[in-house]
Amino acid sequence: MFLLWCKELIVINTNPKRSDEPVWWSLFGAGGTWFAMITPITVLVLGILAPLGVIDAEALSYERVSSFATSIIGALFIIGTLALPMWHAMHRVHHGMHDLKFHTGVAGKIACYGFATIISALAVVFIFMI
């Protein structure tokens, strides 16, 4: 009876084409979350409270900041602060170009995500140079 109602048989593709989009969306989401939750606090502490003298200058001395940057938590924090928002921004640029009818195809994808990869790699390299 169901086959009489449904005029076409639905064929399920058992070997679907895999997309790489979940990788980019996860980096986009992580970057957006980091930028929305961590970056404002970082700007508040380092850009407003420290210059106004609310935070003691000794707390941000070269020795303490260098010690923080060379610890695993500090290195991950700095890399996350530089790399994750860049992935978010480049994903927005890539899809924004598509929305504005700049269909760059694979070249645009490689350019955007390649730039984010370069910035991420430079963040890691600069952390190891400290």
Swiss-Prot record:
Tree of life domain: Bacteria
Membrane topology term: Multi-pass membrane protein
Alphabetical keyword list: Cell inner membrane, Cell membrane, Membrane, Transmembrane, Transmembrane helix
Short name of any one Pfam family annotated for the protein: Fumarate_red_D
InterPro entries: Fumarate_red_D, SQR/QFR_C/D
UniProt record similarity statement: Belongs to the FrdD family.
UniProt function note: Anchors the catalytic components of the fumarate reductase complex to the cell membrane, binds quinones.
Species for this entry: Vibrio cholerae serotype O1 (strain ATCC 39315 / El Tor Inaba N16961)
Name this protein carries in UniProt: Fumarate reductase subunit D
